[in-house]
Amino acid sequence: MNLAEICDNAKKGREYALLGNYDSSMVYYQGVIQQIQRHCQSIRDPAVKGKWQQVRQELLEEYEQVKSIVSTLESFKIEKPPDFPVSCQDEPFRDPAVWPPPVPAEHRAPPQIRRPNREVRPLRKEMAGVGARGPVGRAHPISKSEKPSASRDKDCRARGRDDKGRKNMQDGASDGEIPKFDGAGYDKDLVEALERDIVSRNPSIHWDDIADLEEAKKLLREAVVLPMWMPDFFKGIRRPWKGVLMVGPPGTGKTMLAKAVATECGTTFFNVSSSTLTSKYRGESEKLVRLLFEMARFYAPTTIFIDEIDSICSRRGTSDEHEASRRVKSELLVQMDGVGGALENDDPSKMVMVLAATNFPWDIDEALRRRLEKRIYIPLPTAKGRAELLKISLREVELDPDIRLEDIAEKIEGYSGADITNVCRDASLMAMRRRINGLSPEEIRALSKEELQMPVTRGDFELALKKIAKSVSAADLEKYEKWMVEFGSA
């Protein structure tokens, strides 16, 4: 009997039950229960046989629970069909015969027994008609409708207060609260999704948290940070750049650079991916793009970071391009071109900077490449950068006195920033792995924190380097350098 097959069938039965595929789950449960039954017949040891029977009993209980769920769902299917035809048959007879006669009758308005919005409007028309006839009949209807008119006045005052509050929020004059974007004309769910999933204010990433990349930091300061500090200087031909494209292999710190820009500027940071700006409904993706840029202008100064922009704005006109994808690209290009134009006459400090990152710059559309006026290369870390990155990654870990980070930095040449972080993480776990080797779960739980806080040694790094290889090849680096020679704009 294959024990691995028994475990696999039990696991699949539980997974299918969690996913709601109860029929498949019941099949796996039946199979594993029969397998355990056959396995128990071949066991001679009573203690082991008792444990297997206990496991079989637990699986039987789970199987019964799944069966009860299936029977409950089946009962819903049986009970629902007769309910709907009854209601559908009742409504056609009730609506034309009962409701139409009282609706045109205007005698129900004066008693004011109920006060829905439907009855308030006829009352206003009656009062206007009475006033037109003469002042004689004015006292009687007014005395009967004092309370509704008072409630309307209160509603109007409350509405006025809400409008004033909204204006104050937009002007930033309320009591230190963050202004709220008014998504009039857009679906409320779309606005809430962008607010919830994209907007992150004051990300806590600073320049010092990023090792090396001094040239990239310098250019980003000039393109984004300095126009915020010197708005009077960056005007006319010196206007801020519309967009910056960061090109480089994966794991070199492009996303962290964008977050550092948002932190140093004190701007609102929009982190956008292809899943954020796509929808299965026709025309909704373009609305999301337009809504994103309108929200960015509202929360200005703003940094819009579009990660993996090649997945959104690949080349147009290819044979496999879909119409919906083309419309999204067109809307994005229009909005990006409109960022500078919309802000030329506004306060220069209220700018919207578009940062983009990609690992495949050769797939980007030509029109988008023109709008991203600065195109900078984010390379692999240098020897100095690798040593700095090791210090940043290991600042919370105790190191052995014999470790020299410069020697380790020489051994990890060709590693990206993400690769180096993985090496540091794996090396910092080596001491813990040695300490818990051979211990039972109870003994592991009983270990104190001091026993696990052991220094990282040189041998730990050597073991980690044997397990983790670099993720970027020399051929990839050559492609990036060739593209930068042709299209770079640093």
From Swiss-Prot:
InterPro entries: AAA+_ATPase, AAA_lid_3, ATPase_AAA_core, ATPase_AAA_CS, KATNA1, KATNA1_MIT, Katnal1_chordates, KTNA1_AAA_dom. SUPFAM superfamilies: P-loop containing nucleoside triphosphate hydrolases. Keywords: Acetylation, ATP-binding, Cytoplasm, Cytoskeleton, Isomerase, Microtubule, Nucleotide-binding, Phosphoprotein. Its EC number is 5.6.1.1. GO terms for biological process: microtubule severing; spermatogenesis. Residues 116-127, 143-169 have a biased composition (Basic and acidic residues). Residues 96-182 are annotated as: Disordered. The keyword ATP-binding applies. Interacts with KATNB1 and KATNBL1. This is Katanin p60 ATPase-containing subunit A-like 1. It comes from Oryctolagus cuniculus (Rabbit). The lineage of its organism: Eukaryota, Metazoa, Chordata, Craniata, Vertebrata. The gene is KATNAL1.
